[in-house]
Amino acid sequence: MFAVIRRAGFAASLVLVIGATSGCAPIHVHAYAERGTAFTYRTYAWAPDDAVATGDPRLDNNRFFSDQVRASVDRELAARGLEKIMSAPSDLLVHFHATITQEIEIASSNRFEHCYNCRDMIYDVGTLVIDLVDGRTSRLVWRGWVEKLNPVIDNQDWMEETIDWAVAQIIKKMPPRT
């Protein structure tokens, strides 16, 4: 009997944790690969940073954020057998983009025409995009992104965890090396 309660308690705790960390909207992970591209790439390097600002001071010139994204991508690509190089031309160039926007969700328990007991929730959602560009042809060969991410920029530990998780989910969508 206690084993059943313990299992049910664990399951309920897990659901609570997942619900609490998932934000107001479901997180979506997507990827596109250029058709016909054989992923025989062995090396990669980081492309130069964008000079275009996002307009969000939480992201623009935020070295903590960009360094964490780069470290997470480096770790995930190394786990897939890609070697990071600094000097010679690389097989792939890696680039990332990030945005944070506000969304409004209106919730009501009333299903009729008037909105009684309505409440609106304003929350931030983030999108993180990772691009892989063929180093020889300069063509985009793969793009992966996560959207509806709950961006936690003002807490370093949460930011690092969120970025690590998001990058891992994105890189899982990469085609296998051939």
Question: What do these predicted regions represent?
Answer:
Residues 1-13:
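Bacterial N-terminal signal peptides that target proteins for export
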Residues 2, 22-75, 79, 89, ...:
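A structural "domain/chain start" motif
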Residues 11-21:
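Bacterial N-terminal signal peptides
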Residues 25-39, 123-127, 132-178:
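C-terminal/domain-edge helix-coil "capping" segments
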Residues 27-28, 80, 88-141, 147:
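Surface-exposed short loop/turn segments
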Residues 38, 57-69, 86, 120-124, ...:
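Extracytoplasmic/periplasmic, Sec-exported soluble proteins
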Residues 55-56, 103-105, 152-154:
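Extracytoplasmic/secreted cell-surface and envelope-processing proteins
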Residues 74-82, 102, 137, 171-176:
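Sec-exported extracytoplasmic/periplasmic mature domains
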